Structures are given as structure tokens and as C-alpha cells.
Amino acid sequence: AVMGRNLALNIESRGYTVSVFNRSREKTEEVIAENPGKKLVPYYTVQEFVESLETPRRILLMVKAGAGTDSAIDSLKPYLDKGDIIIDGGNTFFQDTIRRNRELSEEGFNFIGTGVSGGEEGALKGPSIMPGGQKEAYELVAPILKQIAAVAEDGEPCVTYIGADGAGHYVKMVHNGIEYGDMQLIAEAYSLLKGGLNLSNEELATTFSEWNKGELSSYLIDITKDIFTKKDEEGKYLVDVILDEAANKGTGKWTSQSSLDLGEPLSLITESVFARYISSLKTQRVAASKVLTGPQAQPAGDKAEFIEKVRRALYLGKIVSYAQGFSQLRAASDEYNWDLNYGEIAKIFRAGCIIRAQFLQKITDAYAENPAIANLLLAPYFKQIADDYQQALRDVVSYAVQNGIPVPTFSAAVAYYDSYRAAVLPANLIQAQRDYFGAHTYKRT
């Protein structure tokens, strides 16, 4: 696959000779033919491939997550020696990584489940890397990982030891969930600016370009400004001819499922997963649009003022999403005994990965100041933003509701913020109801 090829080329570019193997002989030959003069050495049997490596062997697996990973590991095992290291760089479900780590360590092998973010380009030029597994095995591969990782502005490589067994893949899963949330928040901002102000694509590009110079500076805002003005071969704006059905690979779903297992209110990211699901009901939505009534969007008033409100709402929404995501990391760390370092995790997201953003430094700073902080919203910087920006978020959500513009993640952000700051919630009534019909008992205040 492209990710595997690009990681191999990245490693080779740092002065290493890389043995390569693919089940398909043609694919192996293709990679070698496309990269003449590179220190890539092809092998056509698993045995020859494994025997070409110096011990302890460091084998990077890049295969489709699931049964394919197990069969690849099974094919390697007969030729491995005790202490050899297998690194799984796929988008693997963390529970599978926990299982594989346990099974392989019982046989004397090391297994490092590694999240890799940055897409195909990141794999080649420097991704963000999230390794989890045996600490001593990580130390043996750390020099290579540090050389191939993205480098943040302060010169630090975007890789750090995450924790035992499935910790690396868990952090990658939450990273992907946060990515879903970021993308949906941006999509809702776009919808509001189009629906409320009727901005042209050029105006949208200018707006996002301005936003990218400030607090919202990030990879996703940066690419979005370019997307607005991209045209197809007929000269039409590409974004306007793309069908409004967002696909997904299931990693956002895993994050939400884990939040339910841990009892964590990951509402914003979960709404972003649901938003993709409802977008895929295109036929039903078109039919429903002819039957179900609602308000037509009215102009949102002063242009500059509304743009600034949406910008503030977007930034505060993003903060709520990360607060929920990092709160879930804390719950998972407690549940699985990982001892995660949240400030370091935010640090390795600063370059190479899809969610890279200027404000991640603020998260690192918050944890440096108070490693035990229960929720990022309580950190002084984020509390100040919430104080200053919540009215904009409330105004934008109110406008959207009054004008029939769906804003599931903006709405989730304000609902979570108000629930989290509520000393008293109406859950007492729910407890009374539960006790009434099921003798579930209750606690008195």
C-alpha cells in the first residue's frame, strides 16, 4: 500500500537500507522499479525477508487492519527470534493491539502498536507517530522513529512513547475522533456563512485565509481555504459539484463506542459521526425536504459581525471537542493503566498530522501548569476564551435553530458547556423515576 511504500522511502532517506516484502511479487517489483538507486532491497519469501534483517529485527507491518494483521504476524513468527520487534503501523483497533501484544510477549516477541497520522504525504515527509508497547522495545526503535517523524517548529520530533500495549493505537483513535469533530465544526461554519450571509466561494476563501492567520491557524483551515477556490475541468467550483455524502472508515465510531464503554460524554465527536451518517441518507433527505416544513434562512445581519461570531463559535467549539477528547484519554488511561502524558500527546500533534494546529501548544502548556487538571475548560487560557466567546456561540446556535440550519456539533458544544458548569442537573428526577419503577434506590443531597 502507499502508506507502507512511503514510510519505507522515508526510512531509506535517513540513511538506512530497507528490506521490503509484499505478498504480491508484482507490487514489490513495482516499488523497486519506481525507485531506482534507493537502498530498498526486495525479498519474495517471508523467510528470506526476515533472515535479511539484523537482530533484534525491527519489522514494520503496514497491512489492512483486522484479520490481515493476524495472518501477517502468523507468517512471520516461524522465522523470528526472541526479542525481535514487530511494529504495527495500521489503523488498528486498540483492543486487538492489547491482545496481540499479550500473545506475542508470551512467546518472547515485542509488539509495538503504532498510530501514524499525516496521510500519504506525511508518511513520506514526516508523520506524527504514536507508539505503544514494551518500553524497552520502543527504546530500540526510537532512533529510527525520531528520524522519520515530523518536526515541530521548536525542533522536537512528533513522536513520543505513549504507553503500554494498546495505548498508541488508542491515542490515534481519539486523534481520528477529534479530526471528525474538527471537520464537522468547519463544515457547519461554512454552512452558516453560506446560509446566513450568502458568501461566494472567493469570499469564503478570503475569510478562511484570515482565520488561518490567528487562533484557528491549522492544517484543516489551511486546506479548506484552498478547497473553496479549486475548479474542475469545466471551470465550476469543485466543492459545489461534490455530492453531500460524507464517507467514513469507522475510526470515529470506535472513539464514540469507547466513550460509551468508559461512561465519558464525548458528545461533540459523536455528533460529528452521526452527521456523516445522516449525510449518507441523501435519497431520504431529498424526499423529506419536499414533505417536512421549516423556516427559510433569513440574512444574518452585519457581515463582519456575523463572520466574527462564527469564528469565535468555531474556536470555542474546537476547544470543547478537545476538552472532551482529552477527558476521554484520562478515563482510558485510568481504565487500562497506561499512565498517559497528555501534554506530550498534544505536543506530537503539532506537526505532521491532520489535526495539527497552533492551539495544541496551549494544551501542552495547560498540562505543564497543572498535570492533574480534570478538564481543559478549567485551564486559565481556555476558561478565558469560554468567558469571552460563549455569547458568540450561543448567538450562532440560536440563529441556526431559528433559521433551520442544522448545527449538531455547535449545539453539542454549548449543551456540554452548560451541563459541565451546572452545579445542579435535573438528574434527580431521573433517579426518582428509576426508583419508582424499579427500586433502583437513590442518594439524598
From Swiss-Prot:
One of its GO terms (molecular function) is NADP binding. One of its GO terms (biological process) is organic acid catabolic process. It is an enzyme of class 1 (oxidoreductase). The active site is at K172 (proton acceptor), E179 (proton donor). It catalyses: 6-phospho-D-gluconate + NADP(+) = D-ribulose 5-phosphate + CO2 + NADPH. Its EC number is 1.1.1.44. Coiled coil: none annotated. Substrate binds at N91, S117, G118, G119, H175, N176, Y180, K249, R276, R434, H440. NADP(+) binds at A1, V2, M3, G4, N22, R23, S24, V63, K64, A65, N91. InterPro entries: 6-PGluconate_DH-like_C_sf, 6PGD_dom2, 6PGDH_C, 6PGDH_Gnd/GntZ, 6PGDH_NADP-bd, 6PGdom_BS, NAD(P)-bd_dom_sf, Pgluconate_DH. It comes from the Bacteria. Pathway: Carbohydrate degradation; pentose phosphate pathway; D-ribulose 5-phosphate from D-glucose 6-phosphate (oxidative stage): step 3/3. Keywords: Gluconate utilization, NADP, Oxidoreductase, Pentose shunt. It holds the Pfam family NAD_binding_2. SMART domains: 6PGD. Catalyzes the oxidative decarboxylation of 6-phosphogluconate to ribulose 5-phosphate and CO(2), with concomitant reduction of NADP to NADPH. Homodimer. Belongs to the 6-phosphogluconate dehydrogenase family. This is 6-phosphogluconate dehydrogenase, decarboxylating.
